[in-house]
């Protein structure tokens, strides 16, 4: 299974690997060194923010975990927020790609079943990477206006998966223009509540509810409930 970037041991920040430390790096090409340092800083930001929360995270925390100097950090990022946002974008790149892979793997199936496959992939990955899931879905709301705008833009990247819903729906063009945004908002609010309550590892439990929330605006309550029951039956032992 594909995992989120920099996701190893995110439950608690760890000391840097001695081989990553600054000593002995002078002979490496500068382009390689800068790239390596940047990746380590992004990894450290994810680890620390997942463990401590964004507000409690400091640049000192990040550079200590990364094994990178403050000078190097300042050369690459103008602030803690800038580092966080770049790491955040990397996380959502993987989330969207993971959903897309599941959606495309179900090609040939009815649209509601492909939606269920994509949602199953999403909650499966988030439940495994619950620390980073908290950073991506909850801590981002504490990271300032730009981060919240980035969060809204990230959620909008799931809209293309819902476009076929208009063709599949009996209501068709009568559906409001913001139907996809409302459907995504309803589903992500449930995910947010579960993660904030500390139930990130149990996200698969709400998969049927997520399927209903996304499909209901397009199919109506009865058809969406039928699909929800199908998901429950498919996941039963």
Where would I find each of the regions flagged by the language model?
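Basic, helix-initiating cap at the start of DNA-binding domains
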Residues: 1-52, 61-65
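C-terminal peripheral helix-coil segments that are non-catalytic and often amphipathic
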Residues: 1-25, 124, 128, 160, ...
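Alpha-helical DNA-contacting segments of helix-turn-helix folds
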Residues: 36, 40, 77, 82-94, ...
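Pre-recognition alpha-helix immediately N-terminal to the DNA-recognition helix
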Residues: 40-48, 94, 117, 121
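Helix-turn-helix
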Residues: 48-82, 86
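Short, structured motif recognition centered on aromatic/hydrophobic residues
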Residues: 54, 95, 132-136, 187, ...
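Hydrophobic alpha-helical connector segments
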Residues: 86, 100-128
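Amphipathic alpha-helical packing segments from all-alpha helical-bundle domains
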Residues: 145-168, 177-189, 204-213
């Amino acid at each position: 299974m594909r995992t989120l970037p920099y996701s190893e041991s995110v439950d608690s920040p760890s000391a840097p690997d001695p081989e990553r430390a600054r000593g002995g790096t002078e002979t490496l090409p500068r382009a390689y060194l800068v790239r390596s340092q940047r990746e380590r800083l992004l990894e450290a930001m994810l680890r620390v923010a997942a463990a401590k929360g964004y507000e409690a995270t400091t640049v000192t925390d990040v550079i200590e975990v990364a094994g990178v100097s403050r000078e190097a950090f300042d050369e690459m990022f103008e602030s803690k927020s800038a580092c966080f946002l770049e790491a955040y974008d990397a996380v959502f790149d993987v989330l969207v790609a993971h959903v897309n892979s599941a959606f495309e793997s179900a090609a040939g199936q009815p649209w509601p079943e492909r939606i269920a496959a994509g949602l199953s992939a999403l909650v499966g990955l988030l439940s495994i990477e619950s620390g980073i899931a908290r950073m991506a879905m909850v801590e981002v709301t504490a990271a300032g206006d730009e981060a919240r705008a980035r969060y809204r833009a990230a959620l909008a990247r799931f809209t293309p998966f819902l476009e076929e819903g208009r063709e599949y729906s009996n209501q068709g063009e009568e559906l409001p223009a913001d139907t996809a945004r409302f459907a995504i908002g309803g589903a992500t609010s449930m995910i947010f509540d579960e993660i904030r309550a500390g139930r990130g590892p149990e996200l698969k439990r709400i998969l049927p509810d997520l399927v209903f929330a996304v499909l209901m605006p397009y199919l109506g309550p009865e058809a969406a409930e039928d699909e929800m029951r199908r998901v429950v039956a498919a996941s039963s032992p």
